[in-house]
A protein has these predicted regions:
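Short beta-strand-to-loop transition segments that serve as allosteric relay/switch motifs
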Residues: 69, 142-151
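GAF sensory/regulatory domain recognition
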Residues: 39-43, 52-86, 96
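Signal-transmission linkers at sensory-effector interfaces
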Residues: 1-33, 140, 156-159, 176
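Signal-transducing coupling segments at domain and membrane junctions
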Residues: 60-62, 71-79, 104-127, 147
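A short, aliphatic-rich beta-strand micro-motif
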Residues: 87-90, 126-134
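Amphipathic alpha-helical coiled-coil segments that mediate homodimerization
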Residues: 14-20, 24, 30-49, 53, ...
Length: 176
C-alpha cells in the first residue's frame, strides 16, 4: 500500500542519515568515508543517473566522490577537476550563490555554460540538483545528483540532500 511504501521510504531515509552520522563520529579526521557514505545514501535512496560530492577550498572545487553514469563519463568528469567555481557550472553556481540549484532540463535551462551542456551530453543527464555544503555560512563543497529524464526533483529529495549537505558541512568543520 501507499502508506507502507511511505513508512519504508521514511525508515530508509532515517537509516541513511544515521549511517552518515555514525561515519562522521567514527572518522572525525578522515572525510573520505563521510563523502562515500553520503554518496552511498544518495544512490540508494534517489536512484539518480549520477551523483558527485565536491569539496571547495576557497579557490578550487575538487571532486572527492563520484558514482553513476557511463564509465567513460566518470573519466571525463574527473578530468574537469579541480576547477574554479563558475556560474555556468551547476556545482560552481551552487557554491558561488550558496544556494540550491535545480536544472529541470539542461537543453532549455538558461545561463549554463557550453561545458555543462557538453558534460550533460557525455554523461547522459537532463536534470540536475546541486546543494551547497556550508560551514558558518561559507561554502566548503557541494553534493549534486543528475537524472536521465527532464523534470523537477521532488521536494523530499531536495530536503534530504540538504540534510546530507549539512552533515557533510559538520564533518568538514570537525576535520579542521
Amino acid at each position: 500500500t501507499a502508506a507502507n511504501s511511505q513508512v519504508t521510504e521514511s525508515l530508509d531515509q532515517q537509516t541513511a542519515t544515521a549511517e552518515i552520522l555514525r561515519v562522521i563520529s567514527s572518522s572525525p579526521t578522515d572525510l573520505q568515508p563521510v563523502f562515500d557514505a553520503i554518496l552511498d545514501g544518495v544512490m540508494r535512496l534517489f536512484h539518480p543517473w549520477s551523483a558527485n560530492v565536491c569539496q571547495f577550498d576557497g579557490e578550487l572545487i575538487h571532486l572527492v566522490a563520484t558514482h553513476g553514469g557511463p564509465s567513460e563519463a566518470g573519466r571525463s568528469i574527473r578530468d574537469r577537476f579541480p576547477t574554479r567555481p563558475m556560474a555556468g557550472l551547476t556545482i560552481g553556481r551552487c557554491i558561488l550563490d550558496r544556494a540550491v540549484i535545480e536544472i529541470h532540463d539542461v537543453k532549455t535551462a538558461a545561463g549554463l555554460s557550453a561545458a555543462t551542456r557538453e558534460m550533460a551530453g557525455v554523461r547522459g543527464w537532463r536534470s540536475a540538483l546541486a546543494v551547497p555544503m556550508l560551514r558558518d555560512g561559507e561554502p566548503v563543497g557541494a553534493i549534486s545528483i543528475s537524472r536521465a529524464e527532464a523534470g523537477a526533483f521532488p521536494a523530499g529529495q531536495v530536503e534530504l540532500l540538504q540534510t546530507f549537505a549539512a552533515q557533510a558541512g559538520i564533518a568538514v568543520e570537525n576535520a579542521r
